[in-house]
Amino acid sequence: QKRGKTWNAPQNLGTPLNDEEDNAVTCISADGKTLFVLNAYSKTGKTKVGLSKSRRTINGWSYPEKILIDDFQALSHDEIVDGTKIEKTYTEFSITPDEKVIVMGLKRSQTYGERDIYASFRQSNGSYSRPRSLGPVINTADMEGSPFLAADTKTLYFMSKGHLGYGNGDIFVSKRLDDTWTNWSEPLNLGPPINTSEWNGYINVPAASDYGFVSSKRSKNESHDIYRVTMPPQLRPEPLAVVTGRPTNLMTKKTIPAEITLRSVNGDSVNTVSIDLTFDPEEDGEYKFILPIGQDYVFT
């Protein structure tokens, strides 16, 4: 947690999020109450490759629930580590604020190269569709990964070794041009000083901000560190608005249980938030929506 200009020492979140496997948070919901974590957790068997979801409760974080993705594959590939060839399996995920789309970097049987980027869409039963390749504008015969889909759901940042770059993996940005999710603008290299002659990736650009965070290796003899970078206007996502609030009793001013639905004027549901105080009596009741500007919305 950042206080002023400095960060507190990191705290181990403990079980059930951390276990004997490699653990990582891939996304955090806008209200900070939901974590999407790597691995498909299982109380009855061994943790497998995949994605799970955990909610913050009065007793801590809930046991991560596996997110179901049709025909999910994550194949391994050979990698040289300290001169030794080993098999590695990589999975990377980015989720839209409304949780309707998951963008992922992984290797499947039909992958163009070493790793590609795919999109999967939430279905009526709550599971997600078979991953759809983002196509040859994004994916090359080499490696693409560490995708980050900005909150506008149109601006995609990703790492690539196949597009022309400065080093051993650069960060690029591309804009989605339609709803097929296969039609994208030509990827633009973010350039120096964001990209270096070494590996760069795992960018995260907070909503309604002019900066981002990247994992970067600045020189051959350095390790990967996290850096904050200023995003030039041409590299930023489309403008967004962050809307927050809290349902309260008009007389007592206390937070009350509620289900809040946000709809665009054409009737499409943008997002729904439930505030259940019977489940968590310490629930502060605050909700948060991230919205494209220039549109009209209705709260119910």
Where is each model-derived feature located?
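Short, conserved micro-motifs composed of acidic
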Residues: Q1-E259, V265-N271, T278-T300
